[in-house]
Amino acid sequence: MMFVMLCHFGSGHTGIRLETLALIRDMLNAGISPVVPSHGSVGYLTLEGHIGMVMIGEGRATHQGETLDGAEALKRAGLKPVVLSSKEGLILLSGTTSVTAFASLAIYDAQTLSLTADIAGSFMLEVLKGTLMAMDERLMAVRPHPDQINTAANIRAILKDSPMLERYRGHRVQDALSIRCMPQLYGPVKKAVKDAQATLAIELNSSVDNPLIFDEEDGGAVALMGCNAAKKAYDSMHLAKYILAAELICDGQALDCYDDKRCAKGTQAIYDLLRSKVPEMDNDMPLTPYLEAVTQQIIDRAYIRTVEASVGALKF
């Protein structure tokens, strides 16, 4: 949120002074994080207010792992509270700062999950003795949605040298709809994420205060419930990580059911990374710690890095 404040307030149309803007920058660089409740306001203005409180030496903030009074946090970082001038209190409460901040985090997570879904889906296709026929470049070319094409290309790249797919070639005429239509499902998701990212990039580089300062008076539209929608998207991305974690754990366990576990180079890398946190399960055991561990790997983009190190860059 503080980074978004710098983007929004630094446009030159808000009337904020440079020293006030500089304090936000210095707080970020010093690792001062205001304690901001995520609920409790009609709309979203309370969130920004808690940041402003620390800037004037009130409220609470964390610094070097310790939660302190706002004034003490500033003091330990060698900073001084600001005395707000004309319009600056309003600036710190107005605009779409929290909306844009939550949406930015949601978009980043969505990008991570989109590529991780390609990875988990490839692993699933292999352990279910699937076929790459539905991912054929010729099929993609006659319905040339770019993101659908990219998804199919990712799956082909991960599974291109799979001994398991070769052993079970012709095992069935075609895979289940949920498997063979991964490009048609995951591709539009990529497009939706890209469209949202383009809109967000404009918003991030906008001036969103009300009123704005021009040579001639002007106004702007107000987005109602924007923060609720952005936070809901962010929370949804968090829950989706657990779904992909469960899929990866099931994929790994399915591979362990085979006597011959030889698989594609890409999926072997996925399996090895998975097994670094999750053991082979030969009896009942609590799964929560393993779900948390794999979810953290997903958050850290570990599966994306591992697969790209094995088969090359994935397409988004």
State each model region's role:
Residues 3-6, 24-29:
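Transmembrane helical cores of multi-pass ion-transport proteins
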Residues 43:
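Long C-terminal interaction/binding lobes of large macromolecular proteins
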